[in-house]
């Protein structure tokens, strides 16, 4: 069965970027269509899967996609150069993110002039600050208005900081004599009731799943977008973009796991399918007039991917 859909704006992906954009546009009374490659995620069912899982890894609460069963074995023919844990599903990978929302510091935008490496950004911290404020209000961020981690503020966080745990106090007591201190990062997690979501109850399972929805995930704004009039199509894997004579994307084509297919047209198409899927889609949509892929005259689409580098310790 084929579907032919039309909208003012198509948003590909319902993660944090796509859902926020869809919400704002739907509130502005535009006809918005959201296409997500994954299913809706039921929090109660996800919690059951997590509790029953022997290996409580980052994707344990979430059902595997039909084409990627967890029981299949993985054939490694060489070095595994990139292994992402991003999700397909309404809300995207914010379902299993930690929720830490540190701002960049002013010096991060002036790497060349300040430190002599890299490049300076074409925008400054001061230009972005109002948008940081807006994002923190939308997501619901709990943080200290005095402990800013080098990023000055003109406005207050919408919620007070998450209180330190007993373990935090023990670690702080050990670090103190060593000349080190312990601080609390700003968190997209409710320290009080906020935006119709409950206060954090301290389950200590932000990764991979908040059992009560106190930690922000983008399904919050996907739902708000729908309430404002947006249409959300799940299990719709976009595989090709069509461009018009002015080289603008005018239509998208998608398939579903059951074999059905469809297309959608709009005046504006927003690609918000994360740093891997978005360039992949642009490159997959190459044609005679755009042999390097859509929006790739620079030949840099899909290059220079930088993942998150961190050290996580659990105990």
Residues covered by each model-derived region:
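A short, basic/flexible loop-to-alpha-helix module at the beginning of a structural domain
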Residues: 1-6
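N-terminal Rossmann-like FAD-binding beta1-loop-alpha1 element of flavoenzymes
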Residues: 7-34
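Glycine-rich loop(s) and the adjacent beta-strand/alpha-helix scaffold that form part
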Residues: 27, 31-34, 38-51, 227, ...
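N-terminal FAD cofactor-binding segment of flavoenzymes
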Residues: 30, 37-99, 125-134, 168-176
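A short, glycine/Asx- and small/polar-enriched loop/turn
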Residues: 195-197, 244-250
């Amino acid at each position: 069965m084929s579907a032919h859909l039309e909208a003012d704006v198509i948003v590909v992906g319902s993660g944090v970027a796509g859902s926020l954009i869809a919400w704002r546009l739907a509130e502005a009374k535009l006809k918005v269509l959201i296409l997500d490659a994954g299913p809706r995620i039921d929090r109660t069912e996800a919690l059951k899967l997590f509790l029953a899982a022997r290996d409580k890894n980052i994707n344990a609460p979430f059902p595997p996609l039909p084409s990627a069963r967890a029981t299949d074995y993985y054939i490694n023919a060489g070095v595994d150069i990139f292994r992402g844990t991003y999700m397909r599903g309404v809300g995207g990978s914010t379902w299993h993110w930690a929720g830490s929302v540190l701002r960049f510091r002013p010096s991060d935008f002036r790497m060349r002039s300040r430190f002599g490496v890299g490049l300076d950004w074409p925008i400054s911290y001061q230009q972005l600050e109002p948008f940081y404020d807006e994002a923190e209000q939308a997501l619901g961020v709990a943080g200290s208005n005095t402990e800013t981690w080098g990023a000055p503020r003109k406005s207050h966080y919408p919620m007070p900081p998450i209180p330190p745990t007993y373990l935090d106090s023990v670690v702080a007591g050990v670090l103190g004599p060593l000349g080190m201190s312990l601080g609390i990062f700003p968190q997209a997690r409710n320290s009080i009731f906020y935006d119709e979501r409950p206060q954090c109850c301290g389950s200590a399972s932000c990764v991979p799943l908040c059992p009560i929805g106190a930690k922000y995930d983008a399904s919050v704004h996907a739902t708000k977008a729908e309430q404002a009039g947006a249409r959300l199509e799940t299990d719709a894997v976009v595989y090709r973009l069509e461009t018009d004579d002015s080289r603008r994307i005018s239509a998208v084509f998608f398939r579903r796991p059951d074999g059905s297919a469809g297309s959608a047209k709009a005046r504006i198409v927003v690609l918000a399918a994360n740093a891997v899927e978005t360039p992949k889609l642009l490159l997959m949509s190459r044609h005679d007039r755009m042999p390097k892929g859509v929006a790739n005259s620079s030949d840099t689409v899909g290059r220079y991917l930088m993942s998150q580098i961190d050290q996580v310790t659990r105990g």
